[in-house]
């Protein structure tokens, strides 16, 4: 009898799976395990000089009167580019030959001692100034031209540009475009380089798969295909049976006045499974139940309003998530129908695949304390980061105290009275899928 009761308890706890199937929940494939447990947070120009040296040597061997010739050549060497300098030097070397012929008549002046003494001095001065000095200037004028080389290195960054097209985000964007469906969670997808909401969504798929790009691509593709087929945004406009779903699900939003920070807004989804009047009616038609549950989630995403998000997320920082509360008051954990089991399994599959990284924390309230052993058993198999998001509580009235650290002032007090707050009842402050 006890063995049978434990099994029934485990089956019954799987109702929690219906509430929200996140990628986190898929860690162990059994979200029901998180229902029951104690609370746990947890980079020389030698040519010019060599060309001018023959000019200097010729000037010394010539007579003083012939020295102006090099002087005429030197300026040309300074003002001409490298090829012209070589030509000027060749012309200058040939010039002294004709100038030596008129120099012979001028020989009588040579015996003049003073003239002979002045000539070396003059020659020395002329040879020192034009040749060395002009040569140095030539070298200096060519140095700037060589400095053009660094300009070529500036093209390096341009060569790296194509690499940016291979980042995980841009590859996911290419995958999304190839799929054809343009929307996820109410956001019309656009270039993530300029569209923050799209970048947030693509980053969530990377985060959900621990940065494994191939897995993220696969999940993103399946989500887009599922949304194209299911049309979740249309389900929000669809009216469901009041007899089957009245009072079973609500969405509430709490915002800190005067703040536009994403942390200053909290969105909740509430699943009141204790309000189920007929298991056969509510869970009998699986497709209908899933449509209703998806509509509730899409309403919460509308309140989260990712389309207006302006703050990028990372693997560690992501304020765009939702609180979930599942209330099991008045539910018997010793009985479970095939319909509920089927609904639980399919809901987990659909939500884990199509709504990753949207769960902030999940509270299971009014769960019998006797089922705490299931939570202890679950810790052996579920990843710690997932366990930290599950908070089973036997008393729903103590839920309000869990939000003392929220950026929304006095958030706990805004909750309904039966959850420890001072706010209006869910029927008044919350909204759910359309009913008729």
Curated annotation (Swiss-Prot):
Non-classical phosphatidylinositol (PtdIns) transfer protein (PITP), which exhibits PtdIns-binding/transfer activity in the absence of detectable PtdCho-binding/transfer activity. Regulates PtdIns(4,5)P2 homeostasis at the plasma membrane. Heme-binding protein that may play a role in organic oxidant-induced stress responses. Residues 60-79, 87-168 are annotated as: Disordered. One of its GO terms (cellular component) is cytosol. Residues 87-113 have a biased composition (Low complexity). Residues 248-427 form the CRAL-TRIO domain. It catalyses: a 1,2-diacyl-sn-glycero-3-phospho-(1D-myo-inositol)(in) = a 1,2-diacyl-sn-glycero-3-phospho-(1D-myo-inositol)(out). The keyword Ligase does not apply. It is a peripheral membrane protein. The lineage of its organism: Eukaryota, Fungi, Dikarya, Ascomycota, Pezizomycotina. GO terms for biological process: Golgi to plasma membrane protein transport; regulation of exocytosis. Keywords: Cytoplasm, Endoplasmic reticulum, Heme, Iron, Lipid transport, Membrane, Metal-binding, Microsome, Transport. Pfam families: CRAL_TRIO, CRAL_TRIO_N. Its main location: cytoplasm. Heme binds at residues 273, 293, 326, 328, 362. Residues 134-167 have a biased composition (Basic and acidic residues). InterPro entries: CRAL-TRIO_dom, CRAL-TRIO_dom_sf, CRAL/TRIO_N_dom, CRAL/TRIO_N_dom_sf, Sfh5. This is Phosphatidylinositol transfer protein SFH5. Gene3D superfamilies: CRAL-TRIO lipid binding domain. It is found in: Cytoplasm; Endoplasmic reticulum membrane; Microsome membrane. Transmembrane segments: none annotated. Its cofactor is heme b. GO terms for molecular function: metal ion binding; phosphatidylinositol transfer activity. Belongs to the SFH5 family.
């Amino acid at each position: 009898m006890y063995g049978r009761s434990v099994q029934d308890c485990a089956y019954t706890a799987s109702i929690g799976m219906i509430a929200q199937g996140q990628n986190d929940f898929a860690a162990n494939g059994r979200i029901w395990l998180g229902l029951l447990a104690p609370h746990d947070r947890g980079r020389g120009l030698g040519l010019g000089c060599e060309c001018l040296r023959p000019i200097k040597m010729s000037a010394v061997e010539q007579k003083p009167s012939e020295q102006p010739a090099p002087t005429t050549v030197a300026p040309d060497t300074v003002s001409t580019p490298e090829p012209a300098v070589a030509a000027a030097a060749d012309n200058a070397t040939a010039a002294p030959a004709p100038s030596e012929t008129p120099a012979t008549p001028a020989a009588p002046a040579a015996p003049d001692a003073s003239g002979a003494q002045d000539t070396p001095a003059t020659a020395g001065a002329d040879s020192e100034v034009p040749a060395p000095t002009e040569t140095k200037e030539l070298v200096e004028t060519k140095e700037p031209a060589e400095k053009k080389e660094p300009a070529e290195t500036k093209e390096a960054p341009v060569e790296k540009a194509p690499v940016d097209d291979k980042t995980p985000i841009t590859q996911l964007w290419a995958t999304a475009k190839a799929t054809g469906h343009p929307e996820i969670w109410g956001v019309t997808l656009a270039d993530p380089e300029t569209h923050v909401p799209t970048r947030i969504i693509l980053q969530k798929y990377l985060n959900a798969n621990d940065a494994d790009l191939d897995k993220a691509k696969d999940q993103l593709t399946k989500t887009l295909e599922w949304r194209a087929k299911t049309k979740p945004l249309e389900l929000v406009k669809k009216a469901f049976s009041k007899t089957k779903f009245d009072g079973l699900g609500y969405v509430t939003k709490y915002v800190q006045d005067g703040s536009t920070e994403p942390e200053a807004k909290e969105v909740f989804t509430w699943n009141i499974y204790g309000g189920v009047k007929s298991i056969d009616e509510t869970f009998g038609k699986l497709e209908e139940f899933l449509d209703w549950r998806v509509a509730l989630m899409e309403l919460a995403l509308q309140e989260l309003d990712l389309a207006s998000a302006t703050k990028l997320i990372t693997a560690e920082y992501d304020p765009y998530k939702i609180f979930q509360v599942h209330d099991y008051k008045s539910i018997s954990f010793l009985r479970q129908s095939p319909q509920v089991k089927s609904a639980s399994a399919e809901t987990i599959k659909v939500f884990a695949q199509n709504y990753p990284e949207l769960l902030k924390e999940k509270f299971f309230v009014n769960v019998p304390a006797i089922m705490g052993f299931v939570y202890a058993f679950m810790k052996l198999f579920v990843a710690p980061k997932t366990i930290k998001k599950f908070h089973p509580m036997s008393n729903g009235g103590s839920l309000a105290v869990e939000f003392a650290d929220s950026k929304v002032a006095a958030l706990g007090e805004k909750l309904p009275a039966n959850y420890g707050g001072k706010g209006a009842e869910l029927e008044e402050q919350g909204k759910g899928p359309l009913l008729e």
